[in-house]
């Protein structure tokens, strides 16, 4: 099991993921794509990465917008695994 990060560890890790914030105890980001096809394509690629990590996002999609929340339920909060997935998602979004 992974260990929940402290508040100072989270703040330090957020410096490398500036587009992410913490909302309601979860790592949070909103993406905007050109259209629904691009948003859904990203979600498909993201799902493959998440499945490979066995770490699945909470997400909500409307047209070209995608909201993602990451947390590690077993640890009861944000862990390094959430930041690892956030980095993969950012790399996918960057193309």
UniProtKB/Swiss-Prot annotation:
Q: Which GO biological process categories is it annotated with?
A: tetrahydrobiopterin biosynthetic process
Q: What class of enzyme is it?
A: lyase
Any idea which UniProt keywords this protein has? Lyase
Name a GO molecular-function annotation.
4-alpha-hydroxytetrahydrobiopterin dehydratase activity
InterPro entries xref list: PCD_sf, Pterin_deHydtase
Instruction: Write down the Pfam families for this protein, in alphabetical order.
Output: Pterin_4a
What reaction does this enzyme carry out catalytically?
A: (4aS,6R)-4a-hydroxy-L-erythro-5,6,7,8-tetrahydrobiopterin = (6R)-L-erythro-6,7-dihydrobiopterin + H2O
The family annotation for this protein states: Belongs to the pterin-4-alpha-carbinolamine dehydratase family.
Annotated protein name in UniProt: Putative pterin-4-alpha-carbinolamine dehydratase
Q: Which organism is it from?
A: Solibacter usitatus (strain Ellin6076)
